[in-house]
Amino acid sequence: METSTNQINISLNNNTFPNHMLYKQYKDSGTSSALILPAVMMNVAGIPGIAANLLLIFVTIQNNKLRGSANYLLALTAFFEILHQSAHFLFLFITVSGINFINYSTALKFQLHSIFGLTAAQTSMASIAADRLLSVLFPLKYYKLNIRLYFTIHIILAFISGIWMSINAINFSNKYPTLPVTGYISDLLVLDMEIIFPFIMLLCGINILLYFFVWIVQIMMEVLIQKPQSRLLKSLILIVSIVIGGYVIGCLCKIIIDHFLNLNDIQIWTVNQFAGILINIGASAETPILYIFSSFYREAINKQLRSIFYKRTNSKM
């Protein structure tokens, strides 16, 4: 532990460690708008997303019409995105309190679940794409699947990817336990942990490719899809365009900013916040898109919201 601390101190002194200028600038500055504003922006994007994803999970559980495999996988993705976006609470607390920096190992205790969720959400999105491809390639066999076994397989795949990335984070934390970070989740994804970005890009590419195949199969084979399923597919394609688009643009921006632009690390850290906001907008888009473009989801969400507000109104009377 002492050796690792000494290595970090030497690296900081030699200006070679991630965000070393940011650390020197703000480690003893107390509360600073330069840190608080990004934390607030992340939570402004993230908190509505958490609420929307919770609502999606709840209506999926409550509504008997939302019992298809795609519906379950959408709810699963929403759950993982909640884990991901909850990371921003620590960032806000650290900056508003004026602490500004904590050790990597400490941050990981509060944000390991978010790294798990971030990775698993992408795997779950790929599962949805694979599910849609199966539904158009083998429609008769698809509707005879054992839904519990089928869904369990997708859950296991998502958990495996999330656990794998979590193990990488734990190993990195053991290697550099006292690395100072702001509590922003992207600060945990440095050096060895940058492996998460090509992994996310790979899954995004798989998503796009699978939906492209879905489109091709529908055109070439003229597969007939029931209207509700067709509307769901259109919603899913739009979700992929926005959600995956947010992740792709965010990851590409981070890679370009970190490795190709001649900026100091304070400027890099600040600009990267905008990439993070894009990712969070994408992570929050699932429920609004389903509400707008799927009549089943819109009906279920409206019913649930009326129920919530009706109960609150009665409780006040």
How would you label these PLM feature ranges?
Residues M1-M317:
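Seven-transmembrane-like multi-pass membrane architecture, highlighting hydrophobic TM helices
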